[in-house]
Amino acid sequence: MHYLAVALPLLTLALAAPSNSVPLTPLNSRQYSEDLAERQSWLLDQAKGLRSKYAPHLGERGQELRRRDIIDEGITRRKRANQKRATGTVSLTDVGLDASYAGQVSIGTPAQDFLVIMDSGSSDLWVAGSTCTENFCKQTYTFDTSTSSSFITSSEAFNITYGSGDADGTLGTDTVSMAGFTVSDQTFGVVTSTSANLISYPLSGLMGLAWKSIASSGATPFWQTLAASGDWDSPEMGVYLKRYRGDNTASQIETDGGQILFGGLNTSLYNGSVNYISIDESEKDYWRIPLEAMVIQGNSVSIASSSGGSNPSCAIDTGTTLIGVPSQTANRIYSQIAGAEALSASSGYEGYYQYPCDTEVTVSLQFGGMSYSISNADMNLGSFTRDTSMCTGAFFAMDMSSRSPVQWIVGASFIKNVYTAFRYNPAAIGFAELVGGSSVSAGNPSSSTTGGGTSGSNGGGSSSGAMERKGVQLGWLVGAVAVGVAAMI
């Protein structure tokens, strides 16, 4: 497997992780539900799980109860198969002032609940296992395979590499549920070791929302199984990422961080129609579409590059904070901002640029014939040098390999400004104006972009190439930049 190397420092997200002596804040659990029926259901599941685990050793009465359990499970499965659950909502938790957006996933029998980063830029599901010895594992929720009666272990190793580090463990299969939907035989990674600071409390892992072709495990992603099954009312996911950057009253962990709707779009969150840009069959790897133009401070900027041609392919990545662009493009972007300068390579922050904090930056990207603005709050990440009059920008210089199918990584700094649709069939990415927003306008035909980008539902992606695994996970890699917690130079 190949990975794109990114020479960036690992900046620690300054979250107050609990010590071993402090109990973790409980996630939603049926055991403590205010609903008596929910609590009773949890209790019955504990008994069923125990009987299942020790079935060969049960006495006569236990065997009889186990047979009843099996009948009940079959009835439940048939009922579920005959029911069409139209949509389901993943309520997002905003961690680190927009550094990561996480949803709750339930794994095993009985279910164990975890917060996992919802990442449209990768395709694997993994969670920290209870045998993990890393410090972060001791301070967050971990999956105990021994207490799940439905877990099937595998001897196959699991490894996934990001720009910020890697995670290692083994593959397993179990029942996985999210937003009211269940996949009974989902393959995922049970992680036993990670690079330092890859993730931290309250996070326990990651849910990949991209296509199967880039899954390190080779498993069909949870979302893709559901979209293909017909269980969804509409084969798409609607994404809204809430902004807490610039909110002085916000905390490091905000439970009202937006939502992902499985099975449709939340029409109450956007105005007008959705502008879909088609994805070719050969491009089902990352969620990627071609960029057609860019305007900053009222001036068109050339987006052409040696690797991406006139219309670079952009991965739309909810698991990333920054907007990664080729270094020559970053140069052009910041040359339009008076007083902007690159942070030196010797400082360890190569790729970042800073500019006067009092500068109001207007910037827009054009996809599918429409221009979408990025708010100044998302463009300006805050001050990270001893010169507090200078602020760091969201566009980050990062040259991808010539074999990479994507040249830009478009993260939450952009996605927060639009309502985003990820459509399974026909494959497409769509954008719409958020309610209360004014981020969308007709594209500018006089843009410096030249060549063959098309618009609307007929838009296509860039040419396909040899696949490379995702090599930058900037959402948590640069958590400190996203939340403004470091003074570095």
UniProtKB/Swiss-Prot annotation:
<feature type="disulfide bond">
    <location>
        <begin position="357"/>
        <end position="391"/>
    </location>
</feature>
<keyword id="KW-0843">Virulence</keyword>
<feature type="binding site">
    <location>
        <position position="161"/>
    </location>
    <ligand>
        <name>pepstatin A</name>
    </ligand>
</feature>
<protein>
    <recommendedName>
        <fullName>Major aspartyl peptidase 1</fullName>
        <ecNumber>3.4.23.-</ecNumber>
    </recommendedName>
</protein>
<keyword id="KW-0064">Aspartyl protease</keyword>
<keyword id="KW-0378">Hydrolase</keyword>
<keyword id="KW-0645">Protease</keyword>
<feature type="disulfide bond">
    <location>
        <begin position="132"/>
        <end position="137"/>
    </location>
</feature>
<dbReference type="GO" id="GO:0006508">
    <property type="term" value="P:proteolysis"/>
</dbReference>
<keyword id="KW-0732">Signal</keyword>
<dbReference type="InterPro" id="IPR033121">
    <property type="entry name" value="PEPTIDASE_A1"/>
</dbReference>
<feature type="binding site">
    <location>
        <position position="164"/>
    </location>
    <ligand>
        <name>pepstatin A</name>
    </ligand>
</feature>
<feature type="binding site">
    <location>
        <position position="121"/>
    </location>
    <ligand>
        <name>pepstatin A</name>
    </ligand>
</feature>
<dbReference type="InterPro" id="IPR034164">
    <property type="entry name" value="Pepsin-like_dom"/>
</dbReference>
<feature type="active site">
    <location>
        <position position="119"/>
    </location>
</feature>
<dbReference type="InterPro" id="IPR021109">
    <property type="entry name" value="Peptidase_aspartic_dom_sf"/>
</dbReference>
<feature type="compositionally biased region" description="Gly residues">
    <location>
        <begin position="450"/>
        <end position="463"/>
    </location>
</feature>
<comment type="similarity">
    <text>Belongs to the peptidase A1 family.</text>
</comment>
<comment type="subunit">
    <text>Monomer.</text>
</comment>
<keyword id="KW-1015">Disulfide bond</keyword>
<feature type="glycosylation site" description="N-linked (GlcNAc...) asparagine">
    <location>
        <position position="266"/>
    </location>
</feature>
<dbReference type="GO" id="GO:0005576">
    <property type="term" value="C:extracellular region"/>
</dbReference>
<feature type="domain" description="Peptidase A1">
    <location>
        <begin position="101"/>
        <end position="432"/>
    </location>
</feature>
<feature type="propeptide" description="Removed at pH 5.0; by autocatalysis">
    <location>
        <begin position="456"/>
        <end position="489"/>
    </location>
</feature>
<dbReference type="InterPro" id="IPR001461">
    <property type="entry name" value="Aspartic_peptidase_A1"/>
</dbReference>
<feature type="signal peptide">
    <location>
        <begin position="1"/>
        <end position="16"/>
    </location>
</feature>
<feature type="binding site">
    <location>
        <position position="163"/>
    </location>
    <ligand>
        <name>pepstatin A</name>
    </ligand>
</feature>
<feature type="binding site">
    <location>
        <position position="286"/>
    </location>
    <ligand>
        <name>pepstatin A</name>
    </ligand>
</feature>
<feature type="region of interest" description="Disordered">
    <location>
        <begin position="442"/>
        <end position="466"/>
    </location>
</feature>
<keyword id="KW-0325">Glycoprotein</keyword>
<keyword id="KW-0865">Zymogen</keyword>
<feature type="active site">
    <location>
        <position position="317"/>
    </location>
</feature>
<keyword id="KW-0964">Secreted</keyword>
<dbReference type="Pfam" id="PF00026">
    <property type="entry name" value="Asp"/>
</dbReference>
<feature type="binding site">
    <location>
        <position position="321"/>
    </location>
    <ligand>
        <name>pepstatin A</name>
    </ligand>
</feature>
<dbReference type="GO" id="GO:0004190">
    <property type="term" value="F:aspartic-type endopeptidase activity"/>
</dbReference>
<comment type="function">
    <text>Possesses prevalent extracellular endopeptidase activity at low pH condition. Required for high-density growth in acidic environments. Broad substrate specificity with preference cleavage of the peptide substrate between hydrophobic amino acids. Cleaves substrate at P1-P1' between Phe-Leu. Positively charged amino acids are preferred at P2. Prefers hydrophobic amino acids at the P3 and P4 positions. Cleaves substrate also at P1'-P2' between Leu-Val to some degree. Required for virulence in mouse inhalation model of infection.</text>
</comment>
<feature type="binding site">
    <location>
        <position position="320"/>
    </location>
    <ligand>
        <name>pepstatin A</name>
    </ligand>
</feature>
